[in-house]
């Protein structure tokens, strides 16, 4: 991973220069573009059915998720989509990171770490008990990156999903 090859002081210095902003309605096309680029990287492009209308509805009208952008100067170079979940064991909310994406030409420059630090800061400010996310098991560069930050793989847990037709059938 390129990030590991960087001098730590250089990466930390760069992180202090990274600014963030919350997404606004006008950002819907960019959000969807980043989602599609992430899906391509994850070899899941065919699974993206979201469109601008559904993104606007769920992010801005129903306020079910939040989006922050990492900026280099005034240019969006990466983003995170996240939402609150709840831990009954902790008795408090947490933050679930749905998507973390940095444009390819900006990878290895500290943006991913800066985004996670920003999300950790948001979680602490809001009194959340944890920050969690999923990672594809073949994505070793990301796994190594997360482990380098102190994240722990939840090897005792398996994610289950019911979607589409199966979800509708279960609801009957």
Pin down the residues of each PLM region.
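Conserved beta-strand-loop-alpha-helix junction that forms the acyl-donor binding cleft
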Residues: 133-142, 161-164
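Conserved active-site alpha-helix within GNAT-family acetyltransferase domains
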Residues: 113, 125, 137-156
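Conserved N-terminal entry element of GNAT/NAT acetyltransferase domains
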Residues: 2-26, 168-172
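Conserved acetyl-CoA pyrophosphate-binding loop and the N-cap/start of the following alpha-helix
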Residues: 106, 110-118
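Acetyl-CoA-dependent GNAT
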Residues: 22-26, 33-92, 116, 122, ...
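Conserved GNAT acetyl-CoA-binding A-motif
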Residues: 124-134
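Conserved acetyl-CoA binding element of GNAT-fold acetyltransferases
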Residues: 92-104
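Active-site acidic-Proline motif in GNAT/NAT acetyltransferases
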Residues: 103-105, 109, 137-138
């Amino acid at each position: 991973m390129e990030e590991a090859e960087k001098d730590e002081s250089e990466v930390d210095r760069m992180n202090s220069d990274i600014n963030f902003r919350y997404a606004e309605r006008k950002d819907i096309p960019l959000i969807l573009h980043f989602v599609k680029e992430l899906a391509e990287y994850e070899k899941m492009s065919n699974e993206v059915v979201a469109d601008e209308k559904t993104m606007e509805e769920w992010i801005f009208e129903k306020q079910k998720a939040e989006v922050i952008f990492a900026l280099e100067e005034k240019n969006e170079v990466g983003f995170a989509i996240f939402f609150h979940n709840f831990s009954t064991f902790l008795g408090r909310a947490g933050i679930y990171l749905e998507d973390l994406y940095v444009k390819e030409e900006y990878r290895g420059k500290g943006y991913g770490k800066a985004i996670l630090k920003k999300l950790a800061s948001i979680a602490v400010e809001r009194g959340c008990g944890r920050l969690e996310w999923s990672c594809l098991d073949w994505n070793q560069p990301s796994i190594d990156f997360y482990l380098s930050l102190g994240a722990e793989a939840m090897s005792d847990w398996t994610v289950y999903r019911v979607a589409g037709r199966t979800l509708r059938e279960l609801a009957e």
